[in-house]
Amino acid sequence: MKRSDQRRDAVFALYQHEVTGRPLDELLERAKPFSRQLAEDVEANRAELDELIARHSKGWALERIAPLERSIMRTALFEALHRDDIPVEVAIDEAVELSKEYCGTDAPGFVNGILGAALAERGAAG
């Protein structure tokens, strides 16, 4: 299974966890180690990631952003800021591709804009 597929699995587990309240470990019990670790790390850093997203989503309260888009952005921000083995450009590109495939037509630009602004602020923009 490609890493992009494992990243998608982590994003979907985070999304399901947020929407249904099901325990993350239950949602990830059959997941590959990369997916499991990524989802757990994103959830552990959720407050920091949400604060960054909220600060850069001009005119949008965090709660108004679709849960799947939030999960995609949280994952990309975590990878860009905390994973030295994943280039910032890859984290952003993967997030934009996921939003193109699974979210509304405006989502890719929205996701890209928030990620770009948040990472530029942190000095991590590619």
Regions found by a protein language model. Give the residues of each.
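N-terminal interaction/assembly modules
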Residues: M1-G126
